[in-house]
Amino acid sequence: MLNIVLLEPEIPANTGNIGRTCVATGSRLHLIEPLGFKINEKQLRRAGMDYWKDLDVSVYDNFADFLEKNPECQEKLYMATTKAKHVYTDVAFEEDAYIMFGKESAGIPEEILVEHEEFCVRIPMLENIRSLNLSNSVAIVLYEALRQQNFKQMQLLGELHRLHWKE
């Protein structure tokens, strides 16, 4: 199972969207405090729709608490940042990888990044853009990890509700 880690997320709608994406992909969500909202906030629930109840989510007091409670993540904790030297598509994500994203206003602190330099990845963008939306960034990197695993256990074919596809 892939793991999405949000370090101090600030915007409830982003976290709600990410929660919904985690449910849709069978991924676990890890939230590291302080959060910029309350878990029961209406905007968070609205963005996550009725999927929030199915979300596998854990909340941690801080980054050290997260590391202590997830010791297995040490060699597979990837950090998405605009400051990285490596592109996310150059990484071979493990089936149980942890992919961390920082808060919307500042990203992951540089003190953490330099300690995990070889695990830092970026999404390419034009140089005059500071960053992408957090929930979009999570979806981009998460779906690359899933693609590398051939979308294991995911429904690959869709079905029409009223009509049928031409064969």
Q: What would you call each of these model-derived segments?
A:
Residues 1-167:
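Post-transcriptional modification and biogenesis factors for structured RNAs
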